[in-house]
Amino acid sequence: MWENFIEEKVKEIRETVGDGKAIIALSGGVDSSTAAVLAHRAIGDRLHAVFVNTGFMRKGEPEFVVKTFRDEFGLNLHYVDASERFFRELKGVTDPEEKRKIIGRVFIEVFEEVAKEINADFLIQGTIAPDWIESHGKIKSHHNVGGLPERLNLKLIEPLRDLYKDEVRELAKELGLPEKIYNRMPFPGPGLAVRVLGEVTPERVAIVREANAIVEEEIEKAGLKPWQAFAVLLGVKTVGVQGDIRAYKETVAVRVVESLDGMTANAMNVPWEVLQRIAFRITSEIPEVGRVLYDITNKPPATIEFE
C-alpha cells in the first residue's frame, strides 16, 4: 500500500514544484519529519528544511534532529538557534496564553527571515486529516507557520492531509525514519515553555528538561506505552530536609496519560515502584527539586498539559 502512496506523492510534489524551491518547518515530530523525507525524495536539495531551536526542546533534541536529517537522510537542513531571542521575548511573562502567542509570533518571525533568504516558491506542511476535519473542513493552521503562505506568497503543499496519525506512523516507518521518531509521544508546539508554570527562564527550563528526560527514560525502561509522559515545574517551593537542615526547593509534577487521540485521556496506573524510582532520580539528580507529585486527574476535567 505505502509503496504506491509514496510513488504517487513523490510524483505529485515533483510536478507541483517543477524547477522551484520548497521550504518546510521541521520540528522533529512525526508529521513534519515524514513530510520532509517524502518531499526530499521528490526534489532533493531544492527542499530547504528549517529547524528552529527555540530553547524549549527536549534533552538532546537539536543534536538528534541535525544528526538524523542532515547526516543520515542528507536533507538540506538550516539549523537556527533562536533560543536567546525566545527567552528575551518571554522575560517577565507568566500568563499561559500570552506565552503561547509570543512563542508563535517569534517562531513565525524567525521562519520568515530564513524563508526570505532562501526565496522559496512553496511551503510544505505536515498537516494531517484531524487538523482540518476537527475544524469542519476549515484547515486549522499549524500552530507554528499559520498565515505564512499568504504573507510570503508561498504556494502550500500538504502531502499527508488525508492521513491519520497511525497511518503517518506507518508511512514514517516505511520511509526508514527511526523508531524514536515514528513512535514518539506527542510534544506541545511551544515545547517545555508550557511545562514551566510562571516565568520561562533558561534555568527553569533546564530543570524541567532534566526531569522530563528522567520520566521518559523510566517509563520506557518499565515497558509502559502511554500516550504522553512528562514532568512539569510547578513554580511552588516547599520545605524539605537535606542532611540536618531544612531546605526550600522546587516542586515537580509527573503526568502519565493513556489516550487514543488526545481528545480524552485517563491518568495511567503506573506501578508504584516506577513512580518511586522517578521521584528518587529527580530529587537526587536535580539539586533544585525537593518534592515530586503524581497527577491522577483525567481529561476532562483537566487538559493533558498544564498550560
Swiss-Prot record:
Matches recorded under Pfam families: GMP_synt_C, NAD_synthase
Keyword S-adenosyl-L-methionine: no
Assembly mode: Heterodimer composed of a glutamine amidotransferase subunit (A) and a GMP-binding subunit (B).
Pathway participation: Purine metabolism; GMP biosynthesis; GMP from XMP (L-Gln route): step 1/1
HAMAP family found in the cross-reference section: GMP_synthase_B
Listed GO biological process terms: GMP biosynthetic process
Catalytic activity: XMP + L-glutamine + ATP + H2O = GMP + L-glutamate + AMP + diphosphate + 2 H(+)
UniProt keywords, alphabetically: ATP-binding, GMP biosynthesis, Ligase, Nucleotide-binding, Purine biosynthesis
Native source species: Thermococcus kodakarensis (strain ATCC BAA-918 / JCM 12380 / KOD1) (Pyrococcus kodakaraensis (strain KOD1))
GO cellular component: cytosol
Domain GMPS ATP-PPase stretches: 1-184
This protein's name: GMP synthase [glutamine-hydrolyzing] subunit B
Molecular function as annotated in GO: ATP binding; GMP synthase activity
Role, per record: Catalyzes the synthesis of GMP from XMP.
InterPro entries: GMP_synth_C, GMP_synthase_B, GMPS_ATP_PPase_dom, NAD/GMP_synthase, Rossmann-like_a/b/a_fold
The encoding gene: guaAB
EC number(s) stated in the UniProt entry for this protein: 6.3.5.2
